[in-house]
């Protein structure tokens, strides 16, 4: 756990509301992104994000510091999403993910390179959106949030080896979707060139 997180947690436990605001601001984008990945609905993701921070506040005294605080709050968010999915008994698939892509596009000097990078990221985001929630969540945690296998295992409640196997399968599914998406574009490109 970072020293800054521990300082904020101690301040919150001492009754400092401003410290909780700082903690929320530090993790709100990450929690919302994970909720949006799993629920695939903006309004649901916003509600679950709020629920996550309410639950975090209420149970902050139970946080022991055995893992990173980010891992702990991801687990709270993950479980809140699972609760919401069970409550709705359906996966909601009607919202595109744009904010996450905007944050991930790197600044480049050449406008053409930026456009190519944006299109590539959008394609990956679109394909991630087509995956089941669990696969999308695992790939997001590992590649975009840079969580370790052990941290992901702690969040989802399975062993690190199982996470590794699930990541492998998720990557294969993503590769298959990408291949299906890219082949028609490549064929169309070469047909236009002739």
For each predicted feature, which ranges?
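Structural recognition of an alpha-helix C-terminal capping motif at a helix-to-coil junction
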Residues: 33, 47-54, 67-79
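Sigma70-family region 2
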Residues: 13-14, 40, 53-68, 87-88
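Internal acidic/polar
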Residues: 2, 91-117
């Amino acid at each position: 756990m970072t020293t800054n997180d521990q300082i904020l947690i101690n301040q919150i436990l001492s009754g400092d509301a401003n410290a909780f605001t700082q903690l929320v601001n530090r993790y709100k984008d990450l929690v919302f992104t994970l909720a949006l990945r799993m629920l695939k609905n903006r309004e649901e993701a916003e509600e679950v994000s709020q629920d996550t921070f309410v639950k975090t506040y209420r149970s902050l005294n139970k946080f022991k510091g055995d893992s990173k605080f980010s891992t702990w709050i991801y687990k709270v968010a993950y479980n809140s999403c699972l609760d919401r999915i069970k409550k709705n008994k359906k996966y909601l698939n009607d919202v595109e993910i744009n904010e996450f892509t905007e944050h991930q596009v790197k600044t480049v000097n050449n406008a053409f390179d930026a456009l190519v990078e944006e299109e590539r990221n959008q394609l990956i985001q679109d394909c991630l959106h087509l995956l089941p929630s669990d696969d999308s969540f695992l790939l997001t945690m590992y590649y975009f949030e840079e969580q370790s296998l052990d941290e992901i295992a702690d969040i989802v409640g399975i062993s690190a080896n199982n996470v590794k196997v699930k990541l492998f399968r998720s990557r294969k599914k993503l590769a298959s979707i990408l291949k299906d998406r890219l082949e028609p574009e490549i064929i169309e490109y070469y047909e236009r060139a002739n």
